[in-house]
Amino acid sequence: MRRRYPRLPPLPRAKPRGLLPLLPLLLCLLLPCLLASQDSGPERDAWQRPAEVMDALGLGPDMSVADVGSGDGYFTFHLAARVGPAGKVYAVDIDEGELKKIRRRAKADGLGQIETVLGARGDPRLPAESVDVALIVNAYHEMRDYDAMLAGVFRALKPGGVFGLIEAEDEPGKSRASYHDRHRMPAEVVREDAARAGFRFLREAPGFERPEGRKEFYFLVFEKPQDISAVIPSP
């Protein structure tokens, strides 16, 4: 004989209170934007001080400059404003998606002085002696073929050209792979690499500190000697 149990009424459904049930979804959508805000626009300007960077490199109107490892173009557009319509800015990156963003914005803003260059992992693919200034910002630690990349930057600079490199400081004595993973690079390692490529160290400009002290950045300034025969032997 089948036992019959009393039929219970259905439990009442909880009614959502405003946007509270949607809060996790909203956080997932907004968090990347909040984190990215420190890497662009006025928030980044406040700690990276792009005008001071360009002053330290001696960049002025009508000059040519390469932004190597440009990403989505934070520095590219500051450089374009400094050199003006008669200048030239090469935005170099190995990510075509980032370069598309730069081209789209440059077209919208009427910045014909910006040219994107799809580089290779060991070659910025810039014309020889084409730029007065080259800049690498927070990207050198990502470069596995660093000697080849610096050789390409050296080749692209005009004699007497200036090369600036901004990177997050780290302790020396670790492997290159660890620097890549930690997104940092000791200043002394950069100086050794640059000297090997033929650059002459000029000075260390004032560095930068990320919000909340998460990272401290140094700023090294080098020069391509006027007489490169002194650093590159004749074949």
Feature-to-residue mapping (PLM):
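Conserved SAM-binding motif I beta-strand of class I
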Residues: K88-D93
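Conserved SAM-binding strand-loop segment of SAM-dependent methyltransferases
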Residues: D109-G122
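Core SAM-dependent methyltransferase catalytic element
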Residues: R203-P235
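A short glycine-rich, Lys/Arg-flanked "PGG" loop and its adjoining helix->strand segment in the class I
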Residues: A80-G84, D147-V162
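C-terminal alpha-helical "lid/dimerization" subdomain adjacent to the S-adenosyl-L-methionine
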Residues: R155-E216
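A short acidic, Gly/Pro-enriched loop at the edge of an enzyme's catalytic core
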Residues: M63, P124-A134
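A short SAM/SAH-binding and catalytic strip from SAM-dependent methyltransferases
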Residues: D132-D147
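Conserved class I S-adenosyl-L-methionine
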Residues: D62-G71
